[in-house]
């Protein structure tokens, strides 16, 4: 699903011109969870790297979090709703079965009538999938400016009696504003340099929710075969990274930051080690966000830009893997 070329010729790039994020006010620590299930802080942090996560307040919707994140991104980008040609939301926890969260966001923002808006359901890979779609649309000349949002209310599909899964997940939102820009067709360009997405539907039952509209008419709860997910995730994310690096003609030692989907510290660390990227170049936010699925990458990205870690000109390698199985990678220069 990519049309990138290695030839050095002028081309249209997709630049990230603004980032935003939002975390609900309520924080759930490992000590809090130890009062709910048979676990403790040491057990959770040692195995996952997670110490706390945020959860939505009563009545706080997925679209509410998305609004906070996209408004921050728009402000940082210096754009208004009138500038947007597209709104895309990656989520597995929408407000309603239909319409999409993206449509709801468009209406609340006051985006001009007729502007396309849609959701993407690729679980933890959702943001990478969304950016791939948007990058293709920008390079084909169909749009110029877009809002891309990753947002999840995973607390709504978490079984709080299952200690194997309830320790992992959190709620939150991240957003980016992207805009078409002219590039020279080299790896020194600013913007998306390469993308690649994948899926393997034979892995369906290793990570899924027990509910669904046609199956049970309920949201259900997340169920996961942790050993299989870990084994698959590390290899898949490395595969995606190597693919986008090869597309762009860049070696891993030129990467300034590895920003993986924040699943757990073991997966994050293993991917970094296999790619031979030093620990100090690996961005980790899972310790205070937990696994926020489609929100994790844009959330970590926005936080890292805000705190000054990611700077202008930095080359950022972004892999993800999620239910489906789905996986993919982005290579972006800021």
Regions found by a protein language model. Name each.
Residues 2-58, 162-231, 235, 239, ...:
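Condensing-enzyme catalytic core mediating Claisen C-C bond formation in acyl metabolism
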Residues 16-18, 44, 73, 84-87, ...:
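Buried hydrophobic positions in well-ordered alpha/beta secondary-structure cores of metabolic enzymes
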Residues 22, 90-95, 122-127, 150-155, ...:
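Acidic, glycine-rich active-site loops and adjacent beta-strand->loop/helix elements
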Residues 69-85, 239-256, 304, 308-309:
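Phosphate/pyrophosphate-binding loops at sites that engage ATP/ADP/AMP, CoA/4′-phosphopantetheine
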Residues 299-319, 327-334:
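Catalytic phosphate/nucleotide-handling subdomain of diverse soluble enzymes
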Residues 42, 80-86, 113-116, 144-145, ...:
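Short acidic capping loops at alpha-helix termini that bridge into adjacent secondary structure
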Residues 139-172:
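Flexible, glycine-rich active-site loops centered on histidine and acidic residues
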Residues 45-64, 92-146, 273-300:
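Conserved catalytic cysteine-centered active-site region
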